[in-house]
Amino acid sequence: MIKVIKKDGTKEEFNVQKVVVAVNKSAYRALVTFTEEELDFICNFVTEKVEQMRKKEVTISDMHNVVEGALEQTNPLVAKSYRDYRNYKQDFVQMLDEVYKKSQSIMYIGDKENSNTDSALVSTKRSLIFNELNKELYQKFFMTTEEIQACRDGYIYIHDMSARRDTINCCLFNVQEVLKGGFEMGNLWYNEPKTLDVAFDVIGDIVLSAASQQYGGFTVPNIELILEPYAEKSYEAGIERYEGLGLSRERAEEEAMKDVKREFEQGFQGLEYKFNSVSSSRGDYPFITMTAGTGTGRFAKMATISMLDVRRRGQGKEGHKKPVLFPKLVFLYDKNLHGAGCELEDVFEAGIRCSRQTMYPDWLSLTGEGYIASMYKKYGKIISPMGCRAFLSPWYKEGGMKPADEKDEPIFVGRFNIGAVSLHLPMIYAKSKQEGKDFHEVLDYYLNLIRELHIRTYEYLGEMKASTNPLAYCEGGFLGGHLGIHDKIKPILKSATASFGITALNELQQLYNHKSLAEDGEFALETLRYINEQVEEFKKEDGNLYAIYGTPAENLCGLQVKQFRKKYGVIENVSDREYVSNSFHCHVTEDITPIEKQDLEGRFWELCNGGKIQYVKYPINYNKEAVKTLVRRAMDKGFYEGVNLSLAYCDDCGHEELEMDVCPVCGSKNLTKIDRMNGYLSYSRVKGDTRLNDAKMAEIAERKSM
């Protein structure tokens, strides 16, 4: 009888059933289930190899090697899982030590990686510590050695590593579908609202609950159209109530209309308080976006204007009001509705009034040039941004990635993204030069690394159960989302996108020929075209909806500089500042006009259809006509446009002014300052401190044309 010598020196009889137990555990960790035939093969392989050794005693190390050999022939993914788990005690000690060190920093210093989080709060600290553990687990059990090395060196960056194992990224959530006919949430049945005020309450609950089950931006598209039927119900109920009190029909309609307007204002105010003060189970304030602007009905118009007016007036004590950050507002601009003399020009004017005082709404062109407008012009379909800048590729109702026929139409609402991985282009270029290799050859290597990560992510998430996010997968929030709680979500993932991010195109151009994007940009354009061509081939070969994403580098803008310096040192205009440029944006220090910036960045616009935003810093003090002119110009060019001002509010006397560091009225430095982080706004100063990291603060300090 053959005996196995264990690590502690004890011996026990060889039992192939113990091999079955071990490989099944490894398969479970890899989300794989072996068939009986596969298990029989493994058992026969191991038994045969052990007998061929012609030994009475076999070390556990030799046994592991034999089992690995069997698994490599059966399922390499499980073989990796088995191999990774072998030395788990040593690895886990090291991993937990890293988590402990980071946890001490979080507990006593804080963390500014994500400006949506207030790391002073206990709930946030706990969440951040859990995130550190989750990052380590992701690297240990999901990533290959090559991927880990590429990340540590800085050639690629896996966004939201702490959450990718569990759920999806950003989405266009179908609130309307969830509300229709009622739904279940938290084991309670919610009837469909019968009045506008109840609709606001329920929508707030849906958004906070569903947004907590994902990690990216959560967009409610066309909020005015969602609220419109509930406003109509409130209006009719109001007329009936007032007529019952003896008022004439005309007077009853007048009073009912006033009530609906008040409900809109109170409802949007309630959402603003809820979304900016109630943190999610993730420890952050969910990044919620609401889009509006195309509704032409009386209550749709009222909804949009009320939303904008509530934001413009701000929240807080009388005399100390300031705009909130969430939800981010996006105005859906149609020149045939919002142009001079058109049906919704008054809605457009309300948007301009709001933007010039609060920076929001951002503006999305539906009738200009390019991909987003083409979907609206041809199909009447709006592609609202997911979160701050992500956009979906078309998914057709019948044909999927391609239209089945001329009548087939794309679907956007109810879809989502499964994650982004970004290329650090200056580092990849520097590596190619240092090693004497063709740039495209080195770039291809990292593109394929990202491709493989995405493929495994689709496979991994596909094994998740619908119960992990019931509002999305069971109650209709996502396309195809009427699954049973025990169903796997794999069918829903077909229409999901996965993003290849790009950062620091300006620094890439500088590294190539010592010129900025404002001075040249041709090499950066050529590189971005090449990436698009490669990713398009990946889409055809893999059948996955890959997208090119202009990365909003928040914490990453500083991390990439450190990574570059470690490998290639300090290079002028590449790594000599504390930050790199976001995506295809001109460097923030460029002394260019808003119009010049629009034109320079417009060259890259249609090459980043998976995520993009254009914004300019307005060197003007609440100048309505100037803002209107630049917004209309951006809309003609087909942009998704942000208005950049540097808002500042004195928390002591209530004075507000642009670009203020010390209050000129009372001399206080106790200010709240709001700046654009990337595609969204954030507090660059709250009660003397900031939620932003040092690199981003350094960038903000140098902004001229951002």
Which residues does each PLM region occupy?
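Solvent-exposed, amphipathic alpha-helical segments
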Residues: F45, K49-Q52, P426-S432, L511
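Charged, amphipathic alpha-helical regulatory modules used
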Residues: M1-I106, K696-A701, M706
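Amphipathic, well-packed alpha-helical segments that form the structural scaffold of globular domains
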Residues: N24, T47, R451, I455, ...
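Short, conserved micro-motifs enriched in small and acidic residues
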Residues: E13-F14, S495-S499
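A structural signal for well-ordered alpha-helices, especially hydrophobic packing surfaces
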Residues: N75, V93, S279, H454, ...
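Contiguous, well-ordered alpha-helical segments that form the cores/surfaces of helical PPI scaffolds
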Residues: L225, A498-L511, R529
